Structure formats: structure tokens, C-alpha cells
Swiss-Prot record:
GO cellular component: plasma membrane
Gene name per UniProt: phnC2
Protein topology in the membrane: Peripheral membrane protein
PANTHER family linked: AMINO ACID IMPORT ATP-BINDING PROTEIN, PHOSPHONATES IMPORT ATP-BINDING PROTEIN PHNC
Main location as per UniProt: membrane
SUPFAM superfamilies assigned to the protein according to its UniProt record, in alphabetical order: P-loop containing nucleoside triphosphate hydrolases (SSF52540)
Name the UniProt record assigns to this protein: Phosphonates import ATP-binding protein PhnC 2
Similarity comment: Belongs to the ABC transporter superfamily. Phosphonates importer (TC 3.A.1.9.1) family.
Pfam assignment, any one: ABC_tran
Domain ABC transporter as annotated: residue spans: 5-253
Length: 278
């Protein structure tokens, strides 16, 4: 089966400091994959390259294909990048909504990649597009907020609006960069539940960067662990051992963040997660 995402020998250097080292990765259609690792490990940098938001090195930079089409190679984006981006939904950590617009108008922006630019610039959305946008908001539990300004919503609600926008975009691949990093545990669970539902019921490929490993274990069957710009683990999440995770994140600093959800809530509403032993 052809990979939906294929990363081949990807290298990236910032100001003479290499951030990604010869990364190779294939993700198949319908997978839900977590990219995990400490801050600065390269997981967000990798995701931005897969989205076409960053370019690999010009010399020996490698290549990235998405949905069977070349996205970029050797520091150059493909001429098809605009059409490819229409098939790639990107969810940012800080929501990336237009605060002065209504919730509904923000969701309607998901249609821009699939309509003439002049119509989009004038905000000429059809009645059918508005119906679909309201349907997407209903799916994330926010239909009643359609007329409110985006700035009035909580962080968790804004992130769900961003997911609704990806639904109207009709993206085949959804990339989410630390979508729950700034959210409280209840909001984080709602966001991850929605992403998992999109993966299971719509068959969309979902790749999400996560800092808290308990969410990766709970929601993502496959995990890819990065450290220092290199892939150290790629396989079933159930085989992530405590010893490996301590090595990945370090014995101090990042380690307390790994299971912050369970630490804050206790285990009364979720089954205990057991890590595989090395």
C-alpha cells in the first residue's frame, strides 16, 4: 500500500545548527500517529515540513511526498503546494483563529483552498457551505456558539473551532501541533476525543505532536519518538517502556509533564495505563 506521507532522508539546518538528521518516515492512510519527544526534539519542525510550512535544506535536504504527490525536495516547494495544502489540515497550538470574526466565519475559512480566490476574498460563501460549516460546529459541540466572536471562547473551545475548520476544508490528512499543550485536562480530552473520532469514523490520517505521553498511549496506536532531531523509536505505543521514556525526556525537567493529566485528576474516570517494560 502506498504511504500517505513519505519522508525520505530529511535534513534541516537553522543558522548552521542541524535540527533534523536524515529522517525517514512512512505513514499509511487511516493511521493515527503521535510524534513525541522533549522540547527541541524536532517533532514540531518535522510536522511543519510535512505541512509545507517549512523547507528542508537545499543541499542533501531530502524529500517529502504527501498523498502520492511531491510536496518538497532539496529546499524547494512543489508547484502543486497550494493544491496539496488544501488536502492537509493543520491545527496550531495557539488556535490560529481570526479573533474579530465570528466562530462560523472562522470555520468557513476552511473552504478557501477549494474555491476561486476572488470569491474567498469577498467572503462569498454559498448556503451549502454555511450548512456544512454549522454541521462541523455541531460535530465538535459548538453549534450554539456560531454567532459569537472567536475571541470570546475559551482555549479549548477555540481549538475545537480549529478542528471544525479542518473538517470544512475536507482535508485527507490532519496535522496537529501540540493541540492540547495549553489546555486543562477536561478540554484536552475533548480535543483528543474529536481527533480520534475523525480518525476512526472518517478514516482520516491524523498525526499529532504530544508532550504528555499518557495521551499518546490512550489515543494513538503508533508513536514516533524523536530526540535531538533523530528518530529513536517508531512502533506500537504499547511498547514504550518507562526506561525508554525517562531516557527520551530526561530524569528531570520534562519528566513531570508526561502524565500531568493523571496527576491532576487521579485515576477515577480513566483506566490505569500500564507501560510496557523494557
Amino acid at each position: 500500500m502506498s504511504a500517505v506521507i513519505r519522508v525520505d532522508s530529511l535534513n534541516k539546518t537553522f543558522a548552521r545548527k542541524q535540527a533534523l538528521f536524515n529522517l525517514r518516515l512512512e505513514i499509511q492512510a487511516g493511521e493515527m500517529v503521535a510524534l513525541i519527544g522533549a522540547s527541541g526534539s524536532g517533532k514540531s519542525t518535522l510536522l511543519r515540513h510535512v505541512a509545507g510550512l517549512a523547507r528542508c535544506d537545499r543541499d542533501n535536504g531530502g524529500s517529502i511526498d504527501v498523498l502520492g504527490r511531491r510536496l518538497q525536495a532539496s529546499g524547494r516547494l512543489s508547484g502543486e503546494v497550494r493544491r496539496l495544502r488544501a488536502d492537509i489540515g493543520y491545527i496550531f497550538q495557539q488556535f490560529n483563529l481570526v479573533n474579530r470574526l465570528s466562530v462560523l466565519d472562522n470555520v468557513l475559512l476552511g473552504f478557501l483552498g477549494r474555491m476561486p480566490r476572488w470569491r474567498g476574498s469577498l467572503g462569498l460563501f454559498s448556503a451549502e457551505q454555511k450548512r456544512q460549516a454549522l454541521e462541523a460546529l455541531a460535530r465538535v459541540g459548538l453549534a450554539d456558539f456560531a454567532g459569537q466572536r472567536a475571541s470570546t471562547l475559551s482555549g479549548g473551545q477555540q481549538q475545537r473551532v480549529a478542528i471544525a475548520r479542518a473538517l470544512t476544508q475536507k482535508a485527507e490528512v490532519i496535522l496537529a501541533d501540540e493541540p492540547i499543550a495549553s489546555l486543562d485536562p477536561e478540554s484536552a480530552r475533548k480535543v483528543m476525543d474529536i481527533l480520534a473520532d475523525i480518525n476512526r469514523h472518517d478514516g482520516k490520517t491524523v498525526v499529532v505532536t504530544l508532550h504528555q505521553v499518557d495521551y499518546a498511549l490512550r489515543y494513538c496506536p503508533r508513536a514516533v519518538a524523536l530526540k535531538g532531531g533523530r528518530i529513536l523509536f517508531d512502533g506500537s505505543s504499547e511498547y514504550l517502556s518507562e526506561g525508554f521514556l525517562n531516557e527520551l525526556y530526561g530524569a528531570e525537567g520534562d519528566t513531570p509533564l508526561l502524565f500531568s493529566d493523571r496527576a491532576r485528576r487521579g485515576a477515577e474516570s480513566q483506566p490505569e495505563l500500564t507501560l510496557a517494560r523494557a
